[in-house]
Amino acid sequence: MMRSYVAVLVALAVAIGLPMAASAQARPLDAAQARPDLSGNWIRGGRIDFGPWDFTEAGRQKFESYDFKKDDPAYGCIGASWTRVWLNPNVLVRITQAAETVRLQYEWMDIDRRLPLVDSASPNPKRITIPKMPALGRSTAWYDGDALVIDTIDFAPGYVSTMEKWAGMPQSRSMHTVERLRRTGDVLTVETTHVDPTYYRKPLVVSIEYRKSEFELMEYGCTPEDAAVVAPR
């Protein structure tokens, strides 16, 4: 089973460019190479596709023991995972692209993600964390053709989702995610591949569509005191 899982990881690395040891050796981005224009304000709208998942026994037990009344970190104004952040409806994401960085400002929880752009072949790229949100790990980014790729490791234990029928899908410290952001017209597709051998027998792929928006980014202003008022009891 482990040999099969490793084979899946190798195939995944080749397909999407995960910077695992001895995996993708993508060429550095030429400074003159055109980058996709992802800038602007976006709001969730359109397709959400959770690919099939196959829990390990530990993953199944973790999923079945989830209790939203005490396990959802949103009641403490904390994002559970990047997929959970992207899933939130009716709030904006503003993307700002610069020569050496890309900034994603999420209205939900006022998350400000300032990512360094790196060489995808670097064995030890610069990564950033989000203060007070350890479940969001350490991230770095690069461009790959028409996509912005965001690679994240070192997650704290948490949940891929705390929403709808996916609530309680777990993530462990071994979780490794790759987000690929692509734009087609006024549609932004965020495809996230989750690799977590502790809880899943094969990679979990989630795809979420966003639409261009004329609304402006606003302060979310969550405080633990306010969140506690609406928290279930």
Task: Identify the function of each model-found stretch.
Residues M1-Y5:
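Positively charged n-region of N-terminal signal peptides that target proteins for export
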Residues A24-R233:
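PEST-like low-complexity, intrinsically disordered acidic/proline/serine-rich tracts
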